[in-house]
Amino acid sequence: MKLKNIILSTALLVGFCACDDLFEPAIENHKTVEDLENMPAWAVGLLGHAYISNPLGENANSWKFTDVATDDAVSNDVGNGYLRMATGAWRADNNPVDSWQYLRASWQYLNQFLEISDKVEWAKDEMGSELLKMRFQGDAYGMRALYMYHLLMSCAGWTADGQLLGIPILLESETIYSDFNKPRNTFRECLDQRNRDVEKAIEMLPEEYGDVETTAEVPTKYTQMGADFSQYNRVFGDHAKNRMSARVARAVRAQAALLAASPAYSEGSGVTWEQAANRMAEILANLGTNPIAAIDATGNKWYEDSNGIKNLVAGYN
């Protein structure tokens, strides 16, 4: 009898000491929009996704080996995408040259970032927070323009009734309740949206990133906000090199203008070769009056310059 009481008491003790949420799942570590407002490092991660799938970087497989994508060459790698396409494995759910999915996924992240960026406390001091917000927002607008260009290059085309269409322009992030059957905007409307994003990027970003030594060297748009050189370096200094800048945004606009002026699209885009040339001239003007003279005579032997190699760490050589 005594043994039974011990067993019963032990069972009751275990029962009363068990977890009270045995049948309720624990809260997962998924951040909400409200969480991100107080977590700037996480919030800027949304912008970081646009760089992970950057169409100009190898993470997005932009630099594809296409020498075997011709009629007179074939890969002997049985897993090669072009070989599989040529032998009947090219399907809607197996497209080795697909770019729509990763480009639109990054577009979604950029929209999510822009929606919360005004609410995030980017730094404890007001000036630092404003400068960081300005840089991150300009970065996002510039990257969205870059993605628009690559989406048009991959997906724009003429319809059977003679319309030149681009992509559906989405300026808000999508949710499970969004309308996923939005019609494609015209090519011209897509160009106009890309130009608006480029203008915002130019308005917010410096021409190039890099440390300055005096406040006199800080671009006017930042000194008008009250920023000195140390605050400028903190946000736009050497550590930010290779991010979207005003010069890169202009280059994106010039490239898209060349695409729009090409014979494939000019009739529907309304962009002429002269307009495209003028856009490209804005970029070439940065090279100076005699760019040929500025070319390093021994630049083809960069590997012999030890200082240049050391400077790669800082993002330049």
Functional labels for PLM-detected ranges:
Residues 19-69, 295, 299-306, 310:
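Membrane-proximal, proline-rich intrinsically disordered regions
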Residues 167, 188, 251, 260-278:
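Acidic, serine/threonine/proline-rich low-complexity intrinsically disordered regions
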Residues 243-246, 285, 289-317:
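Extended ligand-binding clefts on enzyme/binding-domain cores
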Residues 45, 79-158, 176-210:
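Conserved, well-structured interaction surfaces
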Residues 210-237, 302-303:
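Charged, glycine/proline-rich intrinsically disordered loops and linkers
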Residues 1-29:
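Bacterial Sec-dependent N-terminal signal peptides
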